[in-house]
Amino acid sequence: MDYLLAFVCGGAICIVGQLLLDIFKLTPAHVMTSFVVIGAILDGFGIYDKFIEFAGGGATVPIVSFGHSLLHGAMHQAHIHGFIGIGMGIFELTSAGISAAILFAFIVAVIFKPKG
């Protein structure tokens, strides 16, 4: 049942993104940025943690979770170190994902030739 719930919740997030692309003709960059900001806003109000408890992996895999992780780390470090902790905490939870994205993008760029 957990897998089904994660699939449905993650799929619902993807459906919203696809509708934004198709109906409102937003660019993928606008949709991605909007989802990151929405994730940060929901985390700021404490809603996204409850959604993660409900949806499991369906809430942690999409890009919305990236905004949640950015703000969650910043708020945690701000409580510990004050204002300077905001800058430290932003990348605390997301540094592994950012590093992996850079590494895999580099590997793909080395292996394949660009078109054009």
Swiss-Prot record:
InterPro entries: Spore_V_AE, SpoVA
Statement: the UniProt record of this protein carries the keyword Thylakoid: no
Organism: Bacillus subtilis (strain 168)
Example of a GO biological process term: sporulation resulting in formation of a cellular spore
Protein name: Stage V sporulation protein AEB
Record keywords: Sporulation
Keyword Transmembrane helix annotated: no
